[in-house]
Design a protein with these regions (language model features):
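Catalytic-core regions of core metabolic enzymes
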Residues: 1-176
Length: 176
C-alpha cells in the first residue's frame, strides 16, 4: 500500500497525487518539488489518513523493511519519525548496534517542520505510531525546525502515552 517515487521533480507532484487519490501512502525520493505542491500533497494525504513521506525523503523503514537509501537494521519495537535522512540513518544504526530494533522509520522530507509545511507528516506519523500496537517507543529527529512548529510537535509528543526520545538537530538555545 506504498508507492515509491524517484522521478524528476517537475513530474513528481501529479504522479504522487494520483497515488494518494488511489489510497496509497507515498514515499518520495523525488526532490525539486515545489513547496506549494508539497503542502497540497501532504494536506491531501492527511485528509485521506495516509502518509506523504517526502518529497526529498531518501530513508525509511516500513514494517522493519528498509526502503530506498536505508541501512538494514534489526526489527523491533521502536518507531522513528525523521525530517533528517542522515539522522534516521545514524539513530537506527545505533539502536541496532545497542541491541534494539526498529519497526518503522518514517521519513518526512527535510522541509516538513518549516513554517510553510507545519509538520503535517511528522504529526500524522507520531499519531500513527501512538496507535500502532507493536510500537513501544517513539523517536523524533528533525533538522532545525521553525520555533512555532517545533512547539506544536512537542505539545503533541507530551500528550501521547508512549515514551518519546526527540532531538531537533542544530537548534539554537531555546531559553525556555
Amino acid at each position: 500500500n506504498v508507492a515509491l517515487f524517484s522521478i524528476p521533480g517537475e513530474y513528481g507532484a501529479p504522479e504522487m497525487e494520483r497515488a494518494l487519490k488511489n489510497d496509497l501512502h507515498v514515499f518520495s525520493f523525488t526532490d525539486n518539488v515545489s513547496i506549494e505542491d508539497e503542502v497540497r500533497l501532504k494536506k491531501l494525504a492527511h485528509e485521506k489518513g495516509l502518509l506523504m513521506m517526502g518529497p526529498d525523503c531518501g530513508t525509511g523503514i516500513i514494517s522493519s523493511i528498509p526502503i530506498a537509501f536505508t541501512n538494514v537494521v534489526s526489527p523491533g519495537n521502536i518507531g522513528v519519525v525523521g525530517a533528517s535522512g542522515t539522522g534516521i540513518q545514524e539513530v537506527t544504526t545505533i539502536i541496532d548496534r545497542l541491541g534494539g530494533g526498529v519497526v518503522h522509520a518514517i521519513g518526512t522530507g527535510g522541509r516538513d517542520l518549516s513554517d510553510k509545511v507545519g509538520a503535517i507528516t511528522v504529526k500524522d506519523a507520531i499519531v500513527a505510531l501512538e496507535n500502532h500496537e507493536p510500537t513501544d517507543v517513539i523517536t523524533v529527529i528533525s533538522k532545525p525546525p521553525a520555533k512555532e512548529v517545533r512547539d506544536e510537535v512537542v505539545e503533541l509528543l507530551q500528550s501521547i502515552s508512549k515514551p518519546v526520545v526527540a532531538i531537533f538537530l542544530g537548534e539554537k538555545d531555546r531559553k525556555s
